[in-house]
């Protein structure tokens, strides 16, 4: 929520700036926000179909909006993928294929961010230090956390026994904490699921061309999300900064905030956004940019996701009644 950040600020001045925003640029911002999830659906479709399972793009778009909604409302964005697996299973995509596809995409999603930041560190180091300042350490921590995540996820996908060992350790811990009471019965179900999972994982390990195609799409997806802020910048009548510089600042926010276990990075994301962007505009305008940017690339997508989830549920209920 942005309310704590607005405490003590001149709300009338901020509202005046918001009312003066150019609506045509905001439409472009919204289109790029939607394109962010559509491109994710394209990646998911490529991965799933490469495993020999048909999937329509419109279904992929539905899964990505549902995933976005549940990521937004759960700590560490942990709820999206389980819900995507559930809805994909409802559409006859096996749990093994959907789980590996989503994990494979997650690895590539993180690699895409590191690839973008790698370009920044190689060619725009001065810009990096100038705008991050004493937050540079947080940027490095974010890069480190993403690297560790990629390594752990890769062990799961590319190691034959990695996922089994991790799952068994997790089961043992849950049993000790009395979360899982019937360990043997749970392990039998887990092993059956892992057999399906490994079938998909073996396929992914041998299809590197899929990796590079999806990586290209995912880099575009990341840039599409970051570009939302550029259109907001234009909507507020700002000038003097290049699109790439605005995109780099937004990418710094992503690296530094993604590591924090808050639902959607709510609160902290807004604060860090203002900290970064008040360096290229006055604080009042930065506050307005934060509200517009967050509204477009988070809350609007959440609302669409809620309608998509509700619509999917209603279609399911209607289908069940027709079969009865």
Give a label for each model feature.
Residues 176-197:
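Short, membrane-interfacial amphipathic segments enriched in basic
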Residues 1-12, 16, 70-181, 262, ...:
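Transmembrane helix-loop-helix hairpins in multi-pass inner-membrane proteins
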Residues 12-20, 88, 193-205:
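A short amphipathic helical element positioned immediately N-terminal to and/or at the very start
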Residues 29-36, 67-74, 109, 217-221, ...:
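Alpha-helical transmembrane segments of multi-pass integral membrane proteins
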Residues 41-69, 232-249:
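Membrane-embedded helical hairpins/re-entrant loop segments and their flanking transmembrane helices
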Residues 20-29, 202-216:
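Membrane-interface helix starts
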Residues 112-114, 193-195, 217-229:
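Core segments of transmembrane alpha-helices
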Residues 2-53:
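Anchoring transmembrane alpha helix of integral membrane proteins
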């Amino acid at each position: 929520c942005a309310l704590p950040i607005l405490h003590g600020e001149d709300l009338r001045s901020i509202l005046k700036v918001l009312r003066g925003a150019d609506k045509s640029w905001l439409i472009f911002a919204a289109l790029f926000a939607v394109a962010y999830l559509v491109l994710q659906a394209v990646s998911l479709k490529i991965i799933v179909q490469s495993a020999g399972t048909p999937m329509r793009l419109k279904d992929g778009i539905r899964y990505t909006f549902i995933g976005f909604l549940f990521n937004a409302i759960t700590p560490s964005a942990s709820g999206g993928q389980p819900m995507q697996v559930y809805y994909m299973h409802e559409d006859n995509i096996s749990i093994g294929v959907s789980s590996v596809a989503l994990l494979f995409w997650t690895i590539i999603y993180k690699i895409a961010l590191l690839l973008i930041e790698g370009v920044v560190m190689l060619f725009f180091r001065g810009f990096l230090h100038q705008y991050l300042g004493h937050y540079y350490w947080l940027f490095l921590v974010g890069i480190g956390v993403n690297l560790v995540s990629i390594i752990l996820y890769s062990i799961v996908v590319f190691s034959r026994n990695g996922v089994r060992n991790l799952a068994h350790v997790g089961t043992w811990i849950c049993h000790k904490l009395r979360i899982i009471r019937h360990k043997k019965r749970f392990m039998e179900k887990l092993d059956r699921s892992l057999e399906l999972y490994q079938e998909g994982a073996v396929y992914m390990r041998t299809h590197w061309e899929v990796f590079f195609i999806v990586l290209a799409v995912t880099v575009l997806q990341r840039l599409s999300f970051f570009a939302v802020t550029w259109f907001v910048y234009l909507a507020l009548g700002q000038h003097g900064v290049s699109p790439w510089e605005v995109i780099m600042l937004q990418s710094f926010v992503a690296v530094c905030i993604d590591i924090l276990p808050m639902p959607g990075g709510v609160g902290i994301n807004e604060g860090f956004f203002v900290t970064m962007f008040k360096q290229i505009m006055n604080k009042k305008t930065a506050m307005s940019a934060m509200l517009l940017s967050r509204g477009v690339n988070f809350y609007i997508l959440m609302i669409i996701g809620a309608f998509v989830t509700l619509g999917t549920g209603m279609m399911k209920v209607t289908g069940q009644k027709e079969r009865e």
